[in-house]
Amino acid sequence: MQRITITIEDDLLAEIDAAAAARGYQNRSEIIRDLARAGLQQTSEDTAQTGPCVAGLVYVYDHAARDLSKRLVQEFHGHHDLALATLHVHLDDNNCMEMTALRGAADEVRHFADHIIAERGVRYGRVVMIPTGEGKPAKARKHGHRHE
């Protein structure tokens, strides 16, 4: 076993300590090891998905973080073929939440989402991927009435 040093925000450490106490962990190392294992297991399950998918990417970030907004915009423009729409919400003076609908090959969607979530200044991120099968994207079709 190796000893490492990590930096954790105060509020996140408080959550870890509360979870450790609630679950009966003897020390921080034990709960952090278990949380890391659970995260790695989830990542393994998520990356196993292949083929076309749709996804919801949700992340919270500090809009004042150095050049983060600019980097995010550049990433989205670089992957405009994946992003269908984005909703931007101001949570407080410092934090914004964005929810983006994505569509594309699962590996490309996963890579893009992972990159956004890993950006410095992104505080929380999650992607939910749903397989769509091998069909073509839906197109408008005639259905018996008109839309004005």
UniProtKB/Swiss-Prot annotation:
Residues forming coiled coils? none
Where Ni(2+) is bound, by residue? Answer: 77, 88, 90, 96
What InterPro entries has UniProt attached to this entry?
Answer: Acetolactate_synth/TF_NikR_C (IPR027271), ACT-like_dom_sf (IPR045865), Arc_rbn_hlx_hlx (IPR013321), CopG (IPR002145), CopG/NikR_regulator (IPR050192), Ni_resp_reg_NikR (IPR022988), Nickel_NikR_proteobac (IPR014160), Ribbon_hlx_hlx (IPR010985)
BP term (GO), one: response to nickel cation
What cofactor(s) does the depicted protein rely on? Ni(2+)
Which keywords describe this protein according to UniProt?
DNA-binding, Metal-binding, Nickel, Transcription, Transcription regulation
* Free-text remark on how the cofactor is bound: Binds 1 nickel ion per subunit.
Please provide, alphabetically and separated by semicolons, the GO molecular function terms listed in this UniProt record: DNA binding; DNA-binding transcription factor activity; nickel cation binding
Q: Which family does it belong to?
A: Belongs to the transcriptional regulatory CopG/NikR family.
Q: What does this protein do?
A: Transcriptional regulator.
Specify the protein name. Putative nickel-responsive regulator
**Which organism is this protein's natural source?**
Bradyrhizobium diazoefficiens (strain JCM 10833 / BCRC 13528 / IAM 13628 / NBRC 14792 / USDA 110)
